[in-house]
Swiss-Prot record:
Task performed by this protein: General transcription factor that functions at the core of the DNA-binding multiprotein factor TFIID. Binding of TFIID to the TATA box is the initial transcriptional step of the pre-initiation complex (PIC), playing a role in the activation of eukaryotic genes transcribed by RNA polymerase II.
CDD domains hit by this protein: TBP_eukaryotes
Lineage: Eukaryota, Viridiplantae, Streptophyta, Embryophyta, Tracheophyta
Subunit and interaction comment: Belongs to the TFIID complex together with the TBP-associated factors (TAFs). Binds DNA as monomer.
Protein name according to UniProt: TATA-box-binding protein
One example of a Gene Ontology biological process annotation: DNA-templated transcription initiation
Stretches forming Sequence repeats: 25-101, 115-192
Location(s) in or outside the cell: Nucleus
Length: 200
């Protein structure tokens, strides 16, 4: 299994991914400043893929199909883009939203584009003893199975949060660059193997 790369197409670079596992990016959250004041009501009325309910949330929610994303557009000109599966897609989507706003007659720019959060996931393909892990790594772990089935591991370096499930599925969140996602996973992998459940 170790040589199965992304979608099994190319081999994994073991210098970068010694575990042989490359976390898949699931969601990118980015922000950009359109640098102009926006009339949200006008945008919601003119754009067909937009909804605006100011009583519920003070932003226009807009969606596009390609890349499949959702944007939150605020009257201040600030915008949040979520749902993209890569940094490039997130930037492309944000540019498309900016263009839609321009076409509606606002002098929208594209300032300070920034990736705010990268969410990745992977599967180590073996079950994990979460109680043992939580006990041994108490300073970084919170595990309360009555409240949430996963162990929450707050890594200090890089500053990343991992959700570790008994099944061996891992969610990695908090990265601003994808290498932090990869580094965090490689840091935790030896710990996971140490607390591997012996299957009866």
């Amino acid at each position: 299994m170790a040589d199965q790369g992304l979608e099994g197409s190319q081999p994994v670079d073991l210098t970068k991914h010694p575990s042989g596992i490359v976390p898949t990016l699931q969601n990118i959250v980015s922000t950009v400043n359109l640098d102009c004041k926006l009339d949200l009501k006008a945008i919601a009325l003119q754009a067909r893929n937009a909804e605006y309910n100011p009583k519920r949330f003070a932003a226009v929610i807009m969606r596009i199909r390609e890349p499949k994303t959702t944007a939150l557009i605020f009257a201040s000109g600030k915008m949040v883009c979520t749902g993209a599966k890569s940094e490039q897609q997130s930037k492309l989507a944000a540019r498309k939203y900016a263009r839609i706003i321009q076409k509606l007659g606002f002098p929208a720019k594209f300032k300070d584009f920034k990736i705010q959060n990268i969410v990745g996931s992977c599967d180590v393909k073996f079950p994990i003893r979460l109680e043992g892990l939580a006990y041994a790594h108490g300073a970084f772990s919170s595990y309360e199975p009555e409240l949430f089935p996963g162990l929450i591991y707050r890594m200090k370096q890089p500053k990343i949060v991992l959700l570790i499930f008994v099944s061996g599925k891992i969610v990695i969140t908090g990265a601003k660059v994808r290498d932090e996602t990869y580094t965090a996973f490689e840091n935790i992998y030896p710990v996971l193997t140490e607390f591997r459940k012996n299957q009866q």
